[in-house]
């Protein structure tokens, strides 16, 4: 078995050299899915996984725009259309200087499995640019988004490819992108998700990823007749996912001790309550300031510069910042301090070594493709509402989100249950693979 896995990874690596993030994602899937493929005659010999790791389409383009000093700037734009076996391509756009082909291919590959897990008819894709919205004026961001969409619009559509937000792409950017698409196509359609509620968006969409990861963690705890009430939680990040994960943790009776950004983390031993969270939301979403400002208002809290929160004693850890933020040493620190549950809010925030340590010690660990699928799930519900030309209430959408996260958890249990442990990595990978693979087999070699 080891030889088959090694041979497969060698072949994929040969085709995708110098793409470490993508290979990391493929390796994690291959190690759990290939043994399953070999055990099933229907999949063995069909090269399905090899077909799944190859994008159906890779789009790369120049994005030229004019800054406030009337100087011409040039960035790169991308869209990876990974797999459309179960539905149109669906996945976010990321605007960040680190964006490259490897990162977007890893995100698109993960998205295929994540979208399959939601049970909604969505394929997988991802896109973005190395443009950095930080420090840019609203007008500069608008000009960039308009230039970006002027090329992207020809590749997307409500039944073809439906982008959404990601790091660096929030409500403001989605608005500018949608406005330009509407101008170019002269039509109002559900081509993007994450829209404002007054112009085709869904209630609960901004909260969905954060809420969803907490719902999933609660499902994990329920396996052992436990719950979130009274638990201490360390959360990284302070963007959309971290904010709403914090909000839902508070709703369910947990105590959130930390939040962070690229400058460091805050530790509030009294817990971040609703009032403090509102201040953080204003600080990050409106003023766009650093998390360190928090300790100026709440002097009992501590700010630790250039560090992450994984040395803090907690029951539950929810990494919500970015890929590979939690490494082996961080994982050791969490285990030493009594952490029993880790649920990924970001995409692949734990390194392979960290994940292996969690699995070896049999703590409850949820990979992002399962635990943070709430965002794309509600994106799918937004697409459904756009098709119906109808808006569901907050309660209806939240109820559907809870149900989807519960169904994802059940799928992980079905395929990931071992003798005395649930391997959620194995469960999520196999469950996602089976849905996509069955569709690919039915559609022939295309």
Task: Describe the residue ranges of each PLM region.
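General beta-strand structural signal in soluble alpha/beta enzymes
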Residues: 160-164, 187-192, 235, 258-261, ...
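Glycine/serine-rich phosphate-binding loop and adjoining beta1-alpha1 elements at the start
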Residues: 96, 115-229
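Structured beta-strand/loop patches that form or line metal/cofactor-binding pockets in enzymes
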Residues: 42-73
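Glycine-rich phosphate/diphosphate-binding loop of Rossmann-like nucleotide-binding domains
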Residues: 193-196, 201-311
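Rossmann-like adenosine-cofactor binding region
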Residues: 264-365, 370
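Adenosine-phosphate binding glycine-rich loop
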Residues: 2-25, 220-221, 335-446
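Phosphate-interaction motifs
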Residues: 61-122, 126, 130
């Amino acid at each position: 078995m080891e030889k088959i896995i090694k041979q497969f990874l060698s072949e994929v690596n040969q085709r995708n050299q110098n793409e470490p993030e993508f290979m990391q994602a493929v390796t994690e899937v291959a190690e759990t899915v290939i043994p399953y493929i070999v055990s099933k005659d229907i999949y063995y010999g069909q090269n399905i996984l090899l077909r799944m790791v190859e994008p159906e389409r890779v789009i790369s383009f120049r994005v030229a725009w004019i800054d406030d000093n009337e100087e011409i700037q040039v960035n790169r734009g991308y869209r990876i259309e990974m797999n459309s076996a179960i539905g149109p391509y669906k996945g976010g756009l990321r605007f960040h200087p680190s964006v490259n082909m490897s990162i977007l291919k890893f995100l698109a590959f993960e998205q295929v499995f994540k979208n399959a897990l939601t049970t909604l008819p969505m394929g997988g894709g991802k896109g973005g640019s190395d443009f950095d919205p930080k420090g840019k004026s609203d007008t500069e961001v608008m000009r960039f988004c308009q230039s970006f969409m002027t090329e992207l619009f020809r590749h997307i559509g409500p039944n073809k490819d439906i982008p959404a937000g990601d790091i660096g792409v929030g409500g403001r950017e989605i608005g500018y992108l949608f406005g330009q698409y509407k101008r170019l196509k002269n039509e109002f359609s559900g081509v993007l998700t994450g829209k404002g509620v007054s112009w085709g968006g869904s209630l609960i969409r901004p909260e969905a990823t954060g809420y969803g990861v907490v719902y999933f963690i609660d499902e994990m705890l329920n396996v052992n007749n436990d719950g979130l009430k009274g638990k201490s939680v360390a959360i990284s990040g302070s963007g959309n996912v971290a904010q709403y994960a914090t909000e839902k943790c508070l709703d369910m009776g947990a105590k959130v001790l930390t939040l962070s950004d690229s400058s460091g983390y805050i530790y509030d031993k009294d817990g971040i309550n609703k009032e403090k969270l509102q201040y953080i939301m204003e600080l990050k979403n409106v003023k766009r300031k650093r998390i360190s400002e928090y300790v100026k208002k709440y002097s009992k809290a501590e700010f630790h510069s250039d560090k992450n929160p994984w040395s803090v004693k907690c029951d539950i850890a929810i990494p919500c910042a970015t890929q590979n933020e939690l490494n082996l040493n961080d994982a050791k620190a969490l285990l030493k301090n009594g952490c029993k549950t880790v649920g990924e809010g970001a995409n692949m925030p734990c390194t392979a070594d960290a994940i292996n340590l969690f699995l070896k010690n049999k703590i409850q660990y949820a990979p992002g493709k399962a635990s943070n699928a709430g965002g794309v799930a509600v994106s799918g519900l937004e697409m459904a509402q756009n098709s119906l030309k109808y808006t569901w209430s907050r309660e209806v959408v939240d109820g559907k989100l809870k149900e989807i996260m519960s169904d994802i958890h059940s799928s992980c249990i079905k395929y990931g249950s071992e003798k005395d442990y649930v391997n959620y990595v194995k469960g999520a990978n196999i469950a996602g693979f089976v849905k996509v693979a069955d569709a690919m087999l039915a559609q022939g070699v295309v």
